[in-house]
């Protein structure tokens, strides 16, 4: 039978039919178990748990056949007795749907719309057959090439360059768009690259050869200014380079392209064209400032990410502008919300310079209603009714600040991305999307049961905004492959938007394609002036040690820290995150509390939540209450320390290193983590790290080599893994050093801000170019999106109550 499967291509239903014939009783036993659960949804881990409960003999028969393959690939099972429907994912980005009648053992294949219709019956009961709005973006991309190999996911720009370079350079006529593109560049009224003396591709090639010949006769270091007038006369303007050597390199790159197009040469050349001088970065929600805000509601890793991003980006822009031979001053503006009630932060200040930069600022624009400016903080789940007016106000402020349009607009998170989409649409500017976290993935079943969560989270609005932005944008940056398409066993954040339903609102039969060439993996790093290895003793910030000693070991219990560590000789398990359900800090505390061996080996220190003031965040309040209960239930005082959120990043860097001194470990136990900046920070300091297998950390860490993956759904196993690590370290102290060094090596290879900023600017150039010379601006889909925005999103946003002032 194995040979049969290898030599014949069967549909999923046919393969299951064969297996049903051969293993009828075993399959019936399992499906009956699942059906007995009653009406509802089983996630992948629950389906596998049910499989593991059947007798071993039955399991063995099913494991190697088609049914075992289907079961391992099943991401969810919908139970509506006597039917069980399965969403099967043979590989990332590829989905098949089927349902089985458990009583008759009949298998049916389903289309995405049919599967979603069936799923909706969980909520709506038997459908009345009324028309349901179905969203399908696939027809708009039907004529556009897409890769099919998994290795192409997240490498969109390489695929695009390969495909379109061949198409663009195949004859003289096809070179006109490139010529037009090079002629349209100007800044503040000054023409760049080419002037109107060059009218056609033949003239361009002639001029380039003439310039190449001349540059071969002058010293490489000759400044551009010395031959600028000569070049202007033949049609070349500033922007090719700052000296003869650099200009010659650029000209030869273009000549090579015209002669024999090559995707790598194309990308290199486009990366040299002066295109990006003004960048706008949007992050409206939370308390966006540089000091004393980390740990405030909705204020965490995203703020750190953007500030580090901006510093690296400005450095790279200045470097490129100098190499291009220009004397232009770049601007980067971080657009966030102005908060008149700034509660001890700078969030009430309109313009604030970013530390460590020369030309980058935070520009704050308030939320506004007909009644005036909104003064207080608003949860990220409640910002939706303000954003359309906010976009108009931001456009007005940008015109004043930049005296023109930006060259790139970068959105962050759902609110920043929809504002970025509206601005890019209005201004005709290249748009980049960074999700950070898509809430649909963080809250399982939040689509099908959206009505239950609507009053608290307004997910109908947020999921609609996400869908709009990811389809509108020119390119999407993710930190990891996992964020796009998950892994063999887990669904990616973006992938979860391929097909889903919001019963009563609309049904998404094709929301996003993870193979779309707009996806690019560009991983950030940690600020290496703050986060550096604990072994670099000359750089260690020993002046912080008394304060850190107080935080960790003081016998005083107050609003800053409660519970004490009685045995200071033990290593410390350390974690630091927002105190919310998804970050799962209370989950880690419970794993620790339940495992006597782990408690014997190590202490646990948690930095999360702010006990110094009453939280406005309902989820944080609930997690605080849970934490107090765990301390009492497991009698943790003596082995556990709970520290309020720490906002001094520089001191936090040294705190990681002090944990290294105890030969401890960092644990990131999140239910789901899009990237895992704290994971990178900890590893950059040399701290062995255990992090969730759901999301980005699974990619950052090579399990067993540069750290360890833990499953937040199996806390007992995670605790046992920690026990195993610390027992090995006790027997062999070099084991700790081995994991620490491997973690550092992993960071140096892949996760630095310099690599990130170079990539972002190159992507902007490439997508800007392709948008100009092809149909990559996707005009048809944008018309569809305009209608979706006006008829669906706007009404949903208006339904969210305005915050009480």
Curated annotation (Swiss-Prot):
Q: Map out region (GT-B glycosyltransferase) in residue numbers.
A: 275-752
User: Known catalysed reaction(s)?
Assistant: an NDP-alpha-D-glucose + D-fructose = a ribonucleoside 5'-diphosphate + sucrose + H(+)
Q: How is it modified after translation?
A: Phosphorylated on serine residue(s).
Q: Name one GO molecular function term.
A: sucrose synthase activity
Q: Which enzyme type, at the first EC level? A: transferase
The record's section on Pfam families has: Glycos_transf_1 (PF00534), GT-B_Sucrose_synth (PF00862), SUS_EPBD (PF24862), SUS_N (PF24861)
Q: Residue positions of the PTM Phosphoserine?
A: 11
Per the record, the GO terms for biological process are:
nodulation; sucrose metabolic process
The EC number(s) attached to this protein equal 2.4.1.13
Keywords recorded for this protein, A-Z:
Glycosyltransferase, Nodulation, Phosphoprotein, Transferase
Described by its record, this protein's role is as follows: Sucrose-cleaving enzyme that provides UDP-glucose and fructose for various metabolic pathways.
Q: Which NCBIfam families does this one have?
A: sucr_synth (TIGR02470)
- Record note on quaternary structure: Homotetramer.
Family, as annotated: Belongs to the glycosyltransferase 1 family. Plant sucrose synthase subfamily.
Protein name as it appears in the record: Sucrose synthase
Organism name? Glycine max (Soybean)
Q: Which gene encodes it?
A: SS
């Amino acid at each position: 039978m194995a040979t049969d499967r290898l030599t014949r291509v069967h549909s999923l239903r046919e393969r299951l039919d064969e297996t049903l014939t051969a293993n009828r009783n075993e399959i019936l036993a399992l499906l009956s178990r699942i059906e007995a659960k009653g009406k509802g949804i089983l996630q992948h881990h629950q389906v596998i748990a049910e499989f593991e409960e059947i007798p071993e003999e039955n399991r063995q028969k099913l494991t190697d056949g088609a049914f075992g393959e289907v079961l391992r690939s099943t991401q969810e099972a919908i139970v509506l007795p006597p039917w069980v429907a399965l969403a099967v994912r043979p590989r990332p980005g590829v989905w098949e749907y089927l349902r089985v009648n458990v009583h008759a053992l009949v298998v049916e294949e389903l289309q995405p719309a049919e599967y979603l219709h069936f799923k909706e019956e969980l909520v709506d009961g038997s459908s009345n057959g009324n028309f349901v709005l179905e969203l399908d973006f696939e027809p708009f991309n039907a004529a556009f090439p897409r890769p099919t190999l998994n290795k192409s996911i997240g490498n969109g720009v390489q695929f695009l360059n390969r495909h379109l370079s061949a198409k663009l350079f195949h004859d003289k006529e096809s070179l006109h768009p490139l010529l037009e593109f090079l002629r349209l560049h100007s800044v503040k009224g000054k023409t760049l690259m080419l002037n109107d003396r060059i009218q056609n591709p033949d003239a361009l090639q002639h001029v380039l050869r003439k310039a190449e010949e001349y540059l071969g006769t002058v010293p490489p270091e000759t400044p551009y200014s010395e031959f600028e007038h000569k070049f202007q006369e033949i049609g070349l303007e500033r922007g090719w380079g700052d000296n003869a050597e650099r200009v010659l390199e650029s000209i030869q790159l273009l000549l090579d392209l015209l002669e024999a197009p090559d995707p790598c040469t194309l990308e290199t050349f486009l990366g040299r064209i002066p295109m990006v001088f003004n960048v706008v970065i949007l992050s409206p929600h939370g308390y966006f400032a540089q000091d004393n805000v980390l740990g405030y509601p909705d204020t965490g890793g995203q703020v750190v990410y953007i500030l580090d991003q901006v510093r690296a980006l400005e450095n790279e822009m200045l470097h490129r502008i100098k190499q291009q031979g220009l004397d232009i001053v770049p601007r980067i503006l971080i657009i966030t919300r102005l908060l008149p009630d700034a509660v001890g932060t700078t969030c009430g200040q309109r313009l604030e310079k970013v530390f460590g930069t020369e030309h980058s600022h935070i520009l704050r624009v308030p939320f506004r209603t007909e009644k005036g400016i909104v003064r207080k903080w608003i949860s990220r789940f409640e910002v939706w009714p303000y954003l359309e007016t906010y976009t108009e106000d931001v456009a007005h402020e940008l015109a004043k600040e930049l005296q023109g349009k930006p060259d790139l607009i970068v959105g962050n998170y759902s609110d920043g991305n929809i504002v970025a989409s509206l601005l890019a649409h209005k201004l005709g500017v290249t748009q980049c999307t960074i999700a950070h976290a898509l809430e649909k993935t963080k809250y399982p079943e939040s689509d099908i049961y959206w009505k239950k969560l609507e009053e608290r989270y307004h997910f109908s609005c947020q999921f609609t905004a996400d869908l709009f932005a990811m389809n509108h944008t020119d390119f999407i940056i993710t930190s990891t492959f996992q964020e796009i398409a998950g892994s063999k066993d887990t669904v990616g954040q973006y992938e979860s938007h391929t097909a889903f339903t919001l019963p009563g609102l609309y049904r998404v039969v094709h929301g996003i394609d993870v193979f779309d060439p707009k996806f690019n993996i560009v991983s950030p790093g940690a600020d290496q002036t703050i986060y550096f290895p604990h072994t670099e003793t000359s750089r260690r910030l020993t002046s912080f040690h008394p304060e850190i000693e107080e935080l960790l070991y003081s016998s005083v219990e107050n609003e800053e820290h409660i519970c004490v560590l009685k045995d200071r000789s033990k290593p410390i398990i350390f974690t630091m995150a927002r105190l919310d359900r998804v970050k799962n800090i209370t989950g880690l505390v419970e794993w620790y509390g339940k495992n006597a061996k782990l408690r014997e080996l190590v202490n646990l220190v948690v930095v999360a939540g702010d006990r110094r003031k009453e939280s406005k965040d309902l989820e944080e309040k609930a997690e605080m209450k849970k934490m107090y209960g765990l301390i009492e239930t497991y009698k943790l005082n003596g082995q556990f320390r709970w520290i309020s959120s720490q906002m001094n990043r520089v001191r936090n860097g040294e705190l990681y290193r002090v944990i290294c001194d105890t030969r401890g470990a960092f644990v990131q136990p999140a239910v789901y983590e899009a990237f895992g900046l704290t994971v990178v920070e900890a590893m950059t300091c040399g701290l062995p790290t255990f992090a969730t297998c759901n999301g980005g950390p699974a990619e950052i860490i090579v399990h067993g080599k540069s750290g360890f993956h833990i499953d937040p759904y199996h806390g007992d196993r995670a605790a046992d893994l920690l026990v195993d690590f610390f027992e090995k370290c006790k027997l062999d102290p070099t084991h700790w050093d081995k994991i620490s060094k491997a973690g550092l090596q992993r960071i140096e290879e892949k996760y630095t801000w310099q690599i990130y900023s170079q990539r972002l600017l190159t992507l902007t150039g490439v997508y800007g170019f392709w948008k100009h010379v092809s149909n990559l601006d996707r005009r048809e889909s944008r018309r569809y999106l305009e209608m979706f925005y006006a008829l669906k999103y706007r009404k949903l946003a208006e339904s969210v109550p305005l915050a009480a002032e």
